[in-house]
Amino acid sequence: MSEQLVTPENVTTKDGKINLLDLNRQQMREFFKDLGEKTFRADQVMKWMYHYCCDNFDEMTDINKVLRGKLKEVAEIRAPEVVEEQRSSDGTIKWAIAVGDQRVETVYIPEDDRATLCVSSQVGCALECKFCSTAQQGFNRNLRVSEIIGQVWRAAKIVGAAKVTGQRPITNVVMMGMGEPLLNLNNVVPAMEIMLDDFGFGLSKRRVTLSTSGVVPALDKLGDMIDVALAISLHAPNDEIRDEIVPINKKYNIETFLAAVRRYLEKSNANQGRVTIEYVMLDHVNDGTEHAHQLAELLKDTPCKINLIPWNPFPDAPYGRSSNSRIDRFSKVLMSYGFTTIVRKTRGDDIDAACGQLAGDVIDRTKRTLRKRMQGEAIDIKAV
């Protein structure tokens, strides 16, 4: 269980009210104790907040009027607002969500048997992966708990209101939007706790996935804080290529990264013994059959399934998209070694909502010193 105290950074209004979306259940119970109330009131309010997407205390009919009045004086339920919506021809929806004076992007991906929400963890990204649009926008700041879980809350409210249109409720959440989640563990972990909590969104730990590019110290801490499904952004079969396209590899190389992954798998039940490998296919960079053989050798001791991701272009990018024939040959080599290999279907590329295309609106792109410091750091992570 993570611990994040209710501090001034949780105060979101000029009147000094606490945003209850910033609190996991443990913190919510402490909040109600401080109000002189029984802790079960926290569970009641959380159920209203997350099961019914309710942000109005007056609508919480099993809460007495006196307590509702007290809550209105000291607290609020404020999710970030959607400022723009784009709908793809394939049913994918991308929302631009206002966080202060910036925007992040959240993507809803419906399928026949599920609906996945891709959630952002930072405004921009500090890791500067060369093939990713988000990285080219620079880095501004970490998102708070309310800004992370608020993306899920806002999407659930929109989708819930649209049930008559047949939109599927959210069944899966992937921390694969803007940012590196492991560089924001103090906010990402409490948000994921709310996703898993029965009084929160009640998702299975196998249906909440965190994706990382390889912040090794933070990955080791993650396993002591929460158990969720893990995906790793590998994208290269050797250090030479990965140093170039995923610069954090210069600090934590592939061998070090995969060793940390195996340590996480030993602790985790959510992953059922194997990790998901994400591998973006860049034309004549990492997509040759020789690269496939190298990748198979590299992963022989790491139980995994492999997702091959056709690269999604963005303006001024230095790469090209691998042809279907090159992807097919690459996939067949991996399968010949016995790896479960899936070529990910591109979704939402007509609205720039596909993998690697999220950019948001990062107002301050000048924080290069902070960005460099954050590369490879697990900053001020608390675990209890």
UniProtKB/Swiss-Prot annotation:
It is found in: Cytoplasm. InterPro entries: Aldolase_TIM, Methyltransferase_A, RlmN_N, RNA_MTrfase_RlmN, rRNA_lsu_MTrfase_RlmN/Cfr, rSAM. GO terms for cellular component: cytoplasm. Its main location: cytoplasm. Disulfide bonds join C118-C355. Residues 111-350 form the Radical SAM core domain. S-adenosyl-L-methionine binds at G179, E180, S211, S233, L234, H235, N312. GO terms for biological process: rRNA base methylation; tRNA methylation. It catalyses: adenosine(2503) in 23S rRNA + 2 reduced [2Fe-2S]-[ferredoxin] + 2 S-adenosyl-L-methionine = 2-methyladenosine(2503) in 23S rRNA + 5'-deoxyadenosine + L-methionine + 2 oxidized [2Fe-2S]-[ferredoxin] + S-adenosyl-L-homocysteine; adenosine(37) in tRNA + 2 reduced [2Fe-2S]-[ferredoxin] + 2 S-adenosyl-L-methionine = 2-methyladenosine(37) in tRNA + 5'-deoxyadenosine + L-methionine + 2 oxidized [2Fe-2S]-[ferredoxin] + S-adenosyl-L-homocysteine. It comes from the Bacteria. HAMAP family: RNA_methyltr_RlmN (MF_01849). This is Dual-specificity RNA methyltransferase RlmN. It comes from Shigella flexneri.
